[in-house]
Structures are given as C-alpha cells and as structure tokens.
C-alpha cells in the first residue's frame, strides 16, 4: 500500500495490519470517534482509507523527517501530509512556521472544499 516499491513483497506491513485491527475493534465496539495517527506522510498512508462525513483531520507541525520518501522540502512534506484532508470535511492545521507550507495546505483544503 504505502510506498510498496520499497518492500520486497506485497504482504501488508505491520503498521497496515495493526491499523486494520484497530478499525475492526472500533467497529465491533461501536466507537463513536477514534483517534487515528498516520504512519508516514498521510496521502498514501493506510489510515487514509477511513471515509466518514464527520472526519476531522489535524495536521501538526511539520519537520524534515522521512525526506527519502516524502520529499526534501517542507512544502513537499506539507503536500503529503495534506493528503489526509477529507473532501467536504474539516481540517485543523497548527500554525505553520512558513507561509509556503500554509499555502500548500490551504490550496488542498480549498480543492476539497474543506
């Protein structure tokens, strides 16, 4: 799923399996709201399979982590992170340090009418 080209085979990762188990437990226990943290990035993350009308996406501070996968600038990383923004939903982004990062997040939010 996420960055499958880095994996030697097509088996799900540990993160993907535990994410699926957590979602199944949420369903089995009729959880009203669950807090789900993305693994790496967000845009192609297995946690991004959750589709709910009341989904709230929260984007916290960005850093230059996983640059070999997400990109080597804060703007590229912001684009990856903003992939969790739901269509017609709600997004909260902690105050980005750079205007260019804020602009990336706002552009994607506008495009998704969030």
Question: Where do the language-model regions lie?
Answer:
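ATP-dependent carboxylate-amine ligase catalytic core
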Residues: 1-51, 68-70
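Acidic, Mg2+-coordinating active-site environments of NTP-dependent enzymes
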Residues: 30-37, 54-114
């Amino acid at each position: 799923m996420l960055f499958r080209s880095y994996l030697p085979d097509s088996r799900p990762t540990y993160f993907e399996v535990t994410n699926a188990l957590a979602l199944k437990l949420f369903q089995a226990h009729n959880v009203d709201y669950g807090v789900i943290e993305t693994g790496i990035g967000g845009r192609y993350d297995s946690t991004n399979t959750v589709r709910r009308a009341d989904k709230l996406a929260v984007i916290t501070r960005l850093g230059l982590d996983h640059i070999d996968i997400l990109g080597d600038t804060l703007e590229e990383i912001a684009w990856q992170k903003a992939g969790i923004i739901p269509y017609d939903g709600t997004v909260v982004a902690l105050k980005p340090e750079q205007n260019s990062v804020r602009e990336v997040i706002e552009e994607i939010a506008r495009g998704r009418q969030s």
